[in-house]
Amino acid sequence: MTANPLPTIEEARSFLRSGRGGNVKVAVLDSGIETSHPLLRGLDLADDLAIVDLNFQIAAIPGEGRDVYGHGTAIAGIIRELAPEAEIGSFRVLGEHLRSRTLIIREGVRLALERGYHILNCSFGCGREDQVLFYKDWIDEAYTLGRHIVASCNNEDFMKREWPGHFPSVITVNFTDCTQAEVFFCRLGQLVEFAARGQDIEVAWTQGGRKKVTGSSFAAPHLSALLARILSRSPSLTPLQAKSLLHTLACPWP
């Protein structure tokens, strides 16, 4: 079997300009998505699930268009703005204080992979060394299935190890003060290789509101959306091929 050829850099730039995310499914593993928000008008979630612990048993229940914090709504708004034709699914794995458990996150990932999501946006990180292998299990599973993981990093020190961001197959994103939503940066030689807009940006928040935020959590969905644009025009890209292409398309990270 002959491998599908990689798009040329000129083709990839064209995909970034013209792609709208059609036929690409993006899973937002976060605090839920407020589907009634005015900035998300018309959004029909492909899935809306909350992963919860019911009497020591992890289960998925209806998310009911609810965000328990605001974080997930912000992520969804960024993705929808940049890739308006992408299908978005909400997998609520973070609680009211943006905390979670490894098993809850793992179940959210399992459901997203099972339901055919191409990109998993993970705007969270766990710095506990004793949890690394649990994260590695699903990162490896996603990689072997050809799915793309986009993650945030530690906001105070992007070199500080957090997972899933500190796995080489993951597209990990720091934030910059760049004001252009479609511009992103790359610096090789470290596991946090990418950076995108994420400082003092206005995003959708709970109760139909807006909020000015800063952090890598809000930079990551920029890359998720731009990757969705590319995949909508070149759907056979593997995670490593896509990451290599993003390296080439990115501006130098100063």
Outline where the language-model segments fall.
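Active-site core segment of subtilase-fold serine proteases
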Residues: 1-86
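C-terminal subdomain of the subtilisin-like protease fold in secreted/lumenal serine endopeptidases
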Residues: 2-5, 10-13, 113, 117-122, ...
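Mature extracellular/periplasmic domains of secretome proteins
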Residues: 14-21, 81, 99-121, 131-147, ...
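Solvent-exposed loop/turn segments at secondary-structure junctions
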Residues: 33-34, 96, 125-129, 155-158, ...
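Subtilisin-like peptidase catalytic core
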Residues: 58-128, 233, 250
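Gly/Ser-rich catalytic serine loop of serine hydrolases
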Residues: 64-73, 156, 211-223
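A cross-family glycoside hydrolase active-site/sugar-binding cleft signature
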Residues: 92, 121-125, 150-154, 175, ...
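Extracellular S/T/G-rich loop segment that most often corresponds to the catalytic His/Ser-adjacent loop
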Residues: 162-232, 236
